[in-house]
């Protein structure tokens, strides 16, 4: 399935592919600023997950994991100087499915599973069948 078929709003809002496909890292690692390992709270411990964060596919576990690298809850996706923001997406059951990171330009960057990284508008992936909706915005000082 094509990128635009999976995320119909990308066609409307525009996007740019910024890297080749790779399975070296996923969207969670990319949101944390890493591109050398896969982040996921799998119970078996195969993927990296921050020490002290529950190995559960829950919003709470993701909030704890990102607090270990300096993120805290934020009320807005509006860019702020000296601040990096990430968005956590959830499906209809409230389970985390995706994360995106805000760039200094105000655009957002996402790693699409084992596919490419893209730059996109904040709401371009929101409401898709694939990732669901943004549940939380987090921020940390740069």
Explain the meaning of each model-derived region.
Residues 11-13, 26, 82-86, 105-106, ...:
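Generic structural motif recognizing short loop/turn segments at the entrances and edges of beta-strands
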Residues 12-65:
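Cysteine-nucleophile protease catalytic domains, especially the papain-like/related folds used
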Residues 53-115:
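...with weaker cross-activation on analogous glycine-rich loops/strands in unrelated enzymes
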Residues 1-9, 15-16:
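Ribonuclease/tRNase effector modules and their secretory precursors
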């Amino acid at each position: 399935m094509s990128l635009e078929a999976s995320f119909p709003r990308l066609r409307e809002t525009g996007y740019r592919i910024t890297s080749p496909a790779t399975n070296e890292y996923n969207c969670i690692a990319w949101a944390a600023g890493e591109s050398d390992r896969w982040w996921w709270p799998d119970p078996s411990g195969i993927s990296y997950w921050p020490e002290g964060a529950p190995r559960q596919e829950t919003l709470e576990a993701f909030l704890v994991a990102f607090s270990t690298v300096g993120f805290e809850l934020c009320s807005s996706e509006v860019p702020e100087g000296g601040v990096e923001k990430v968005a956590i997406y959830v499906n209809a059951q409230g389970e985390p499915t995706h994360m995106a990171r805000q760039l200094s330009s105000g655009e957002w960057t996402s790693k699409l599973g084992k596919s490419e990284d893209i730059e996109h508008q904040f709401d371009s992936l929101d409401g898709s069948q694939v990732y669901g909706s943004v549940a939380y915005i987090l921020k940390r000082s740069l």
